[in-house]
Amino acid sequence: MNVSKWIGTGIALHAALVAGAAAAPSVALDIGHFLEKPGATSARGREEFSFNRELALEIERALKQHGLRTQLIGADGAQIRLGARATQGRGADFFLSVHHDSVQPHFLQTWEHAGEARNFSDRYAGFSLFVSRRNPAPGASLACASALGEALRRAGFQPSLYHADPIAGESKPFADRANGVHYYDNLVVLKSAASPAVLFEAGVIVNRDEELVLGQAGTRERIAVAVAAGLGGCLDAKGTKRER
């Protein structure tokens, strides 16, 4: 056996694998909110940040299985300004901010859960996706948002659509109604991102039934697999080279 040739081949193969991994598209996963200001409160009193972190970690696993590189932002729950979140994701090829949804205050009702009065609204359910036309890559942002929405619908999830309602606090026009994509031009994390960017509202946690579904590990896995499929396909379609 030619040992030198074998070693040389091994080194070359390792270098090729390293180069392939480095060429894989990267996704910055922004975990919405932080411990001191955890976002919306669910119908049963759970803070949005905990939903966001659990789902983002599941999405990270799915993206890695799909061959993508990832960067988590905000996983430790420390406060990060909105503009700084976008700055932290500047090295990535795509920026995805993970959230869970509520409703406008006038839609909230009160019920008792575990001996405490809690706000809820069963009026709306479903996911929403947002893009900004002030992002430096609005076309790519919309293309990937549409791909995400389509993949989520194929997985059995439905868009909420209510963010387009002509009421105070909403009126976010559709960018792609069928796939639940809205324009939200002034959203800081979207317009400040250096790469194509989407904000993903996975579901409405003030809806009592949807909260229970979103809290299930199986649901998180289904969402994550759909997100990885949609985003992976979008990045491929953009011509980004990725090791398969």
Give, region by region, the residue ranges found by the protein language model.
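Boundary at the C-terminal end of the N-terminal hydrophobic targeting segment
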Residues: A19-P25
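Positively charged n-region of N-terminal signal peptides that target proteins for export
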Residues: M1-K5
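Alpha-helical transmembrane segments and their juxtamembrane interfaces
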Residues: A15, A40, F107-Q109
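Active-site-proximal helix/loop segments of hydrolytic enzymes
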Residues: S50-R244
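Generic hydrophobic-segment detector
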Residues: T9-G10, A22, L35, S42, ...
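Short glycine-rich His-centered loop
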Residues: P25-G45
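Bacterial N-terminal signal peptides
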Residues: G8-V18
